[in-house]
C-alpha cells in the first residue's frame, strides 16, 4: 500500500509503516513515496 509519506530511502518508511501495519510491516521507497 502506498502511504502519503515522502521518502528518499526505505529506512524512512519503516516507522510509519510499522505504526500503521504493525511491527512485521515491510517498507519500500518508490517514486519518493513510501510503500508498505
UniProtKB/Swiss-Prot annotation:
Q: Where is this site: Basic residue of the functional dyad?
A: 28
Which molecular function terms from Gene Ontology are attached?
A: ion channel inhibitor activity; potassium channel regulator activity; toxin activity
**Classification via SUPFAM superfamilies:** Scorpion toxin-like (SSF57095)
Question: Which Pfam family, just one, is annotated for this protein?
Answer: Toxin_2
Tissue expression summary: Expressed by the venom gland.
- Give the matching Gene3D superfamilies: Knottin, scorpion toxin-like
**One GO CC term, this protein:** extracellular region
Give the record's keywords alphabetically: Calcium-activated potassium channel impairing toxin, Disulfide bond, Ion channel impairing toxin, Neurotoxin, Potassium channel impairing toxin, Secreted, Toxin
What InterPro entries does the record point to? Scorpion_toxin-like_sf (IPR036574), Scorpion_toxinS_K_inh (IPR001947)
Task: Enumerate the subcellular locations listed in this protein's record, separating them with semicolons.
Answer: Secreted
Q: What is its main location?
A: secreted
Which superkingdom heads the taxonomic lineage of this protein's source?
Answer: Eukaryota
Bridged cysteine pairs (disulfide): 7-29, 13-34, 17-36
Q: Which family does it belong to?
A: Belongs to the short scorpion toxin superfamily. Potassium channel inhibitor family. Alpha-KTx 02 subfamily.
Q: Quote the entry's note on domains.
A: Has the structural arrangement of an alpha-helix connected to a beta-sheet by disulfide bonds (CSalpha/beta).
Q: What does this protein do?
A: Inhibitor of voltage-gated potassium channels (Kv). This protein is capable of displacing the binding of radio-labeled noxiustoxin (AC P08815) to rat brain synaptosomes with high affinity (about 100 pM). It is also capable of inhibiting transient potassium-currents (resembling I(A)-type currents), in cultured rat cerebellar granule cells. About 50% of the peak currents are reduced by application of a 1.5 uM solution of this toxin. Is lethal to mice (when less than 100 ug are injected).
Protein name per its UniProtKB record: Potassium channel toxin alpha-KTx 2.7
Q: To which species is this protein native?
A: Centruroides limpidus (Mexican scorpion)
